[in-house]
Amino acid sequence: MEVRQGANARDVKGYDTERLRNDFLIQNLFPADDFKLVYSQIDRIIVGGCMPVNKELTLEAGSELKAAYFLERREMGIFNVGGNGSVIVDGTEYKFKYRDGLYIGMGSKEIKFKSEDSSKPAKFYFNSTPAHKTYPTVFIDPEKDIKDEFKLQLGSVEGCNKRLNRKYILPGQVETCQLEMGITTLEPGSVWNTMPCHTHDRRMEVYFYFEIPEEDIVVHYMGEPTETRHIIMRSEEAVISPSWSIHSASATHAYAFIWGMAGENQDFDDMDWVDMKDLK
């Protein structure tokens, strides 16, 4: 597990491209038959991924957590962005197709991942945050289980930002201690997300971009509103966004992204909007 320290806005505005990428960008999230785990000291979120191909994978706590098992003091949300597969939680198997999700509450001891077909392996992306209480484990099929009020059609064709935001893990849909996750999908011809942009001092966020053709890129915007920076990203990469940073993107092709948040306020609308004229 890689551990990354927090970052403050005064320092970050002096970072060069390499430093920005080293501190905030997460690549190679789906190693074959292994895990990629990044522990960010920003709100103690863990960003991870795995791709079981020839064997079943078991998630271990490792020395970094100083815990008997991974979810001893944590909760997590898992999404599948590959072929069909399964997650087994303390002996209960949850079968995933593409874009299915799962919330696992604190205290679950054994978490295993496997693919249905090794030639089309599942790709499991997940976020994990500290927890103080056990909530029920919940499987989420986006076509069947997400309530209408948690499916938001946003943007417009004229604004090149028409998109559907599905809130998978959020109070009222799935109860958690602090973790919130969902998927936003841009329609063909739309390339902007979250513009006008915002920050939220009470939460940090991680974006995971996917469904981007190999020859295309996403330009992720970050930094304070008056000190913006960018990171060039490609499909199946994630980026850490501190609470003081904007988090927005444009791209050379439509795309989707999984958003995950950690912090003290689960009110999704608790955002500090930034007027376009104030951006620099």
Curated annotation (Swiss-Prot):
Cofactor binding note of this UniProt entry: Binds 1 zinc ion per subunit.
Binding of Zn(2+), residues: 198, 200, 205, 247
Catalytic activity as recorded in UniProt: 5-dehydro-4-deoxy-D-glucuronate = 3-deoxy-D-glycero-2,5-hexodiulosonate
Domain of life according to the entry: Bacteria
Hydrolase recorded as keyword: no
Pathway(s) per entry: Glycan metabolism; pectin degradation; 2-dehydro-3-deoxy-D-gluconate from pectin: step 4/5
Keywords: Isomerase, Metal-binding, Zinc
GO biological process terms, semicolon-separated: D-galacturonate catabolic process; D-glucuronate catabolic process; pectin catabolic process
Cell cycle as UniProt keyword: no
Cited Pfam families: KduI
PANTHER family linked to this entry: 4-DEOXY-L-THREO-5-HEXOSULOSE-URONATE KETOL-ISOMERASE
Function description: Catalyzes the isomerization of 5-dehydro-4-deoxy-D-glucuronate to 3-deoxy-D-glycero-2,5-hexodiulosonate.
Family as reported in the entry's similarity comment: Belongs to the KduI family.
Protein name: 4-deoxy-L-threo-5-hexosulose-uronate ketol-isomerase
Source organism (scientific name): Lachnospira eligens (strain ATCC 27750 / DSM 3376 / VPI C15-48 / C15-B4) (Eubacterium eligens)
Taxonomic lineage of the native organism: Bacteria, Bacillati, Bacillota, Clostridia, Lachnospirales
